[in-house]
Amino acid sequence: MIFRTLGKSNLQVSAVGLGCMGLSHAYGAPADKEDIMTLLANAVDMGYTFFDTAEIYGTPDNPHLNEEMVGEALAPYRNKVVIATKFGIRFDHPELPGNHPLIPDSRPEIIRAAVEGSLRRLRTDHIDLYYQHRIDKNVEPEVVADTMSELIKEGKILHWGISETTEQYLRRAHEVCPVTAVQNRYSMMARWHESLFPVCKELGVGFVAFSPLANGVLSECYNTESKFDAQTDYRAAMPQYQKDSFEKNKCLFEMIEQLAMEKHATPAQVSLAWMMSKKPWIVPIPGTRCLCRLKENIGAADISFSQDEVMAIDKALSSMGISDVFGGSRIVDKAQ
């Protein structure tokens, strides 16, 4: 397996990680536990060393289900893998169906309670990479970073990061406690966070790309006939999965198909290889429940594009019509 180092840290991870959210959250009913255990064990055997979860990736009945399953499945391989999890948000009215608004809460006492819960559920004495899941505008970045510094000194976390950060927030937090990685949405259909690349390079911060296949649509395994449960699967409401979007994205899909033919690869592999060819510190974390997709995704690490090819792809992307893409759950501000 090919490895990458996140920024200037000493944290080495597999060039492609595994986003575990969809195993139990947002993509239909949770997968069968035995299937998840098998999938994660196979991922380790294939060379995956980087696994991403969060304290809220569960169900209304068990909001911490994802961490529990990831912790159990990876316990036999704990010294071989890097586990990333997240703190700092809760769902508004999680008992209701559909995509729930998020309530940020990064007060120090909340963070400390969260880290203890995650350590217990993940069956570990330390978290390799601990992300602030969403920015809490009621808590200054310096306060969050200071809490992270304390947790690092206590050995409860080894590195920390920020998900969906801005440049100003990253700079302020990094000044207090160096940030190892940011985790933001990034794909051929969602390139707005490329604006962070210069500051990531300057500060030596890695970039972890979530939804690198635009919630699966760039795998080109779906079409206008694909159906999703509106009660349990966020894709039912995502703009890129609406019928008119498939027509709007036709040129994009055709370009990816052509690149796949040229590289003797799949559309998903092309999408992942494109971003990995941009910077050596970009690590995508696509999710899947299928062993075949698991193997396919990690195979993207063996495919590369030259910088001229990357520039040509970027130019084409900028010139073509592309549908909107799901940009994340709505954030609501509630008094703490």
Please state what every model-predicted region is:
Residues 13-17, 49-50, 80-86, 126-130, ...:
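Structural preference for beta-strand elements that scaffold enzyme active sites
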Residues 30-43, 106-121, 166-172:
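Short, acidic/polar
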Residues 135-320, 332-336:
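Beta/alpha (TIM)-barrel catalytic core signal, keyed to glycine-rich beta->alpha loops juxtaposed to Asp/Glu
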Residues 24, 55-60, 134-137, 186-189:
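Short histidine/acidic/glycine/proline-rich micro-motifs that form metal-
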Residues 45, 71-79, 120-123, 152, ...:
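Acidic (Asp/Glu)-rich catalytic clusters
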Residues 1-82, 322:
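N-terminal binding-site loop/beta-alpha segment at the start of enzyme catalytic domains
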Residues 64, 91-105:
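Surface-exposed, active-site-proximal loop segments in enzymatic domains
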Residues 119-137:
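Active-site groove signature of glycoside hydrolases
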